[in-house]
C-alpha cells in the first residue's frame, strides 16, 4: 500500500527547512530510524553532500538519521533496502535525468507501490505524477524521458501561484501555461500551493495543510479543491 507525503515546498516563508511539516513527519515516520535522501535535484547547484547535510539537520530534530543515496556504490540496492525515502526539491530536469542515469526510477516506483514510506517536496513531488511536464523549472539537462513515477493519476504543479491583481507582469501565468499543456496532453494537473501537501494512503488521496488546491482538466473550467479527501481520475 502506498504511503506518501507529497508537499508543494520544503520551506514556507518565515520558517526553516521542513519546519512547517515536522509535526506531520513526526507521526508519519514514527517507526523510521534511518531515511534515504535523494539529493539529485541540487537546488541552486549545491553539492549532494551539502544538500544531504541540510536534510540531516532537519530530521535530527525528530531523531531520524539521514543518509544520501550518492553515498552508496549501488543506488538501486539502497532504494530496495531503505526504511523510508525523501526526495528533495531543486531542478526537476536534473532530478529525473539522474534517476534515469542511475537506473533507479523503476526501482523507486516498485518500492513505493509496495509500501516504503516516501516524502517528496517540490521536484520530489513533481516526479510522483504521470510525468514531469508541469514543472516550473528550466531544462538545464535533457532526461531521456519526461515519464516519472505515476504514483498519482495526475500531474503536480508545485509552488502553484495565482495571478496577482494589478500586476504589470506580462509573462504567462501558471494557469495559462497549464492551459497550453492541455492543448497537447490529456493528464489532469493539480496546482499545489505552498503550505499544502497530499497524503496518499493506498488509493486514498487527501489534501492537507493550509491552502486549497486548484485542479485543471482538459476542456474544463479550473476548480478549487477544498482540504480533505480528493477524487481525481
Predicted feature descriptions by range:
Residues 64-117:
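Flexible gly/pro-rich beta->alpha loop and the following alpha-helix that scaffold active-site loops
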Residues 32-40, 70:
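A short beta-strand-loop structural module common to alpha/beta enzyme folds
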Residues 1, 30-35, 82, 115:
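A general structural motif
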Residues 5-6, 84-88, 119-120, 156:
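Structural motif
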Residues 2-31, 42-53, 139-233:
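C-terminal and late-domain segments of enzyme folds
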Residues 43, 93, 125-128, 197-199:
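Short, active-site-adjacent cap segments at secondary-structure transitions
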Residues 96-98, 105-167:
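Class I SAM-dependent methyltransferase SAM-binding "motif I" and its flanking Rossmann-like core
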Residues 53-65:
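Short helix-loop-beta junction
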Amino acid at each position: 500500500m502506498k504511503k506518501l507525503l507529497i508537499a508543494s515546498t520544503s520551506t514556507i516563508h518565515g520558517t526553516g527547512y521542513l519546519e512547517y511539516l515536522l509535526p506531520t513527519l513526526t507521526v508519519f515516520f514514527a517507526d523510521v530510524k534511518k531515511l534515504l535522501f535523494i539529493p539529485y535535484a541540487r537546488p541552486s547547484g549545491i553539492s549532494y553532500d551539502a544538500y544531504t547535510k541540510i536534510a540531516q539537520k532537519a530530521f535530527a530534530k525528530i531523531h531520524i538519521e539521514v543518509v544520501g543515496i550518492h553515498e552508496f556504490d549501488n543506488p538501486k540496492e539502497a532504494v530496495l533496502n531503505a526504511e523510508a525515502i525523501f526526495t528533495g526539491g531543486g531542478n526537476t530536469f536534473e532530478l529525473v535525468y539522474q534517476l534515469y542515469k542511475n537506473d533507479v526510477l523503476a526501482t523507486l516506483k516498485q518500492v513505493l507501490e509496495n509500501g516504503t514510506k516516501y516524502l517528496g517536496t517540490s521536484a520530489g513531488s513533481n516526479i510522483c505524477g504521470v510525468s514531469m511536464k508541469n514543472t516550473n523549472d528550466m531544462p538545464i539537462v535533457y532526461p531521456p524521458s519526461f515519464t516519472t513515477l505515476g504514483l498519482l493519476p495526475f500531474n503536480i504543479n508545485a509552488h502553484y501561484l495565482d495571478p496577482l491583481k494589478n500586476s504589470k507582469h506580462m509573462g504567462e501565468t501558471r494557469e495559462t501555461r497549464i492551459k497550453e499543456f492541455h492543448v497537447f496532453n490529456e493528464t489532469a494537473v493539480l496546482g499545489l500551493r505552498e503550505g499544502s501537501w497530499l497524503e496518499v494512503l493506498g488509493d486514498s488521496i487527501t489534501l492537507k495543510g493550509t491552502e486549497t488546491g486548484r485542479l485543471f482538466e482538459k476542456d474544463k473550467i479550473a476548480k478549487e479543491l477544498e482540504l480533505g479527501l480528493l477524487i481525481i481520475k
